[in-house]
């Protein structure tokens, strides 16, 4: 579909343990990822999530990723205490029931299942709120959202009265960015 399923969850633990706790599922109105390359070909990252058709077991989506949580696990603090880190997994909103599988890469390079849950796209528990419209200004580009890269600049530190200055600063930054490779070819 052309919508997104957003799964918010937390990773918790210490230097030697990792647990996953679900927070929420949310339907978002647009899918900004590829409609063609749904299976991650690179097998990169310390974590991977996969979406399987619940009836056939067929893999229909996968993505590898790394987390700040796993970096924190290597610190001295992680040897003395536990912490919780928020994470998000997004994937095309499923048409039918699916199984979500989150795996962690071991020291041997192999993935093992860390968390699994069934998802029914018709579930009452999936939040379906329409997001509030936000004020945004397009600086450059007009490409297909499935094949384009979106870069958002947040006006943090600018007051409402300084929005024109903010837009001019962003335009200037975009000019610098699009003057450099590889962005100069893909504007």
Residue ranges and their predicted role:
Residues 1-87:
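N-terminal prosegments of processed precursors
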Residues 44-48, 97-99, 148:
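Exposed beta-strand and adjacent loop surfaces of beta-rich binding modules
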Residues 50, 101, 152:
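Residues in well-ordered beta-strands of folded domains
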Residues 57, 108, 159:
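Surface-exposed, flexible loop/turn segments at secondary-structure boundaries
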Residues 63-67, 114-118, 165-170:
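"Short basic amphipathic alpha-helical interaction patches in structured regions
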Residues 79-145:
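Extended acidic/polar, glycine-enriched regions
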Residues 125-184:
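Fold-level signature of zinc-dependent metallopeptidase catalytic domains
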């Amino acid at each position: 579909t052309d919508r997104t399923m957003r799964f918010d969850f937390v990773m918790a633990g210490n230097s030697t343990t990792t647990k996953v706790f679900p927070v929420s599922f949310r339907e978002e109105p647009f899918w900004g990822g590829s409609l063609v390359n749904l299976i991650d070909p690179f097998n990169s990252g310390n974590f991977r999530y996969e979406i399987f058709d619940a009836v056939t077991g067929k893999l229909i989506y996968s993505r590898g990723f790394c987390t700040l949580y796993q970096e924190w696990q290597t610190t001295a603090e992680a040897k003395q205490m536990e912490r919780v880190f928020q994470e998000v997994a997004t994937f095309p909103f499923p048409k039918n029931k699916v199984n979500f599988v989150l795996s962690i890469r071991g020291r041997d390079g192999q993935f093992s299942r860390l968390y699994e849950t069934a998802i029914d796209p018709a579930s009452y528990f999936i939040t379906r709120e329409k997001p509030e419209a936000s004020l945004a200004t397009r600086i450059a580009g007009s490409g297909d959202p499935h094949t384009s890269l979106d870069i958002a600049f947040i006006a943090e530190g600018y007051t409402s009265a300084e929005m024109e200055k903010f837009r001019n600063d962003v335009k200037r930054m975009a000019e610098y960015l699009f003057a450099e490779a590889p962005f100069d070819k893909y504007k």
